[in-house]
Design a protein with these regions (language model features):
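Juxtamembrane boundary at the C-terminal end of a transmembrane helix
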Residues: 218-231
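Small-residue-rich transmembrane alpha-helices that serve as helix-helix interface/gating elements
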Residues: 44-46, 174-181, 206-215
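C-terminal hydrophobic structural anchor segments
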Residues: 153-194
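Interfacial loop-to-transmembrane junctions
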Residues: 192-211
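Transmembrane alpha-helical segments of multi-pass membrane transport proteins and ion-pumping complexes
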Residues: 51, 55, 179-187, 215
Length: 231
């Protein structure tokens, strides 16, 4: 991975993330765990990793160390800063694409299996992917996150058509609505104060979405009904 990225530290972050996610999918499936339960766990893990990656990339690339040196009035060369920034971006790109792909796969599996908890969890994952893209600077990362969210949304719409074939028009209306919202977002250029307010709202919605993943995943495992029966 270091040879592919052209940077050893970036390769550690990207390759380590990919290896951890592959192991997270492979080991439970080989042990016979149901795919939808593995998807529920990996959905939470993948979204969580996406939230941690920007900070981890800065630490592993040495940017935080250089910032500390600069804060202490120690000399920092431009070459070292450029190398650290390049390492952070390369490692972040590979790791983010891997985590987004894992979250997309988890969302598709959840959307393709019956059950309200699974469908809600898939929708939350799609929303989390869209909200997470604000933290990633490169186009490849943003495109992967948006494509993943749209793919999961497509899976949910297909589930709708499969379960209720007589309401196919609802799927068409929902798809047109998504396209209309996307075009409006691309065309509208709000003033700076509206952007700042929008970021605050998005931060709160993202926090609520991520927090909701865990109790909904508990429902996928069927533990909510057991807890209700117990108490």
């Amino acid at each position: 991975m270091g040879a592919v990225t052209g940077n050893g530290r970036a390769g550690v972050l990207g390759g380590g993330t990919m290896l951890a996610l592959v192991a997270g999918w492979s080991v439970p499936l080989l042990l016979g765990m149901p795919a939808e339960r593995v998807a529920a766990v990996l959905a939470i893990a993948s979204v969580g990793v996406l939230g941690l990656l920007p900070r981890i990339a800065m630490i592993t690339s040495g940017l935080t160390r250089l910032d500390d040196r600069r804060s202490n009035d120690e000399p920092v060369s431009r070459v070292s800063v450029q190398a650290a920034v390049d390492s952070a971006h390369r490692g972040l790109a590979v790791a983010a694409i891997a985590a987004a792909t894992s979250a997309t796969l988890a969302g598709l599996i959840l959307a393709s299996t019956p059950g309200p908890w699974r469908l809600v969890l898939a929708a939350l994952v799609a929303g989390a992917l869209l909200l997470r893209m604000r933290a990633f600077p490169l186009a490849a990362e943003v495109v992967t996150l948006v494509a993943g969210a749209l793919t999961i949304a497509g899976g949910l719409l297909l589930c709708w058509v499969r379960e209720r074939p007589g309401t196919w028009w609802g799927t068409a209306v929902a798809a047109l609505g998504v396209c209309a919202v996307a075009l409006a977002i691309l065309a509208y250029r709000p003033p700076p104060h509206v952007l700042a307010r929008g970021r605050q709202v998005a931060d709160r919605v993202e926090a609520l979405t991520v927090m909701a993943l865990v109790p909904v995943a508990v429902g996928v495992f069927g533990l909510n009904s057991r807890l209700l029966d117990t108490f």
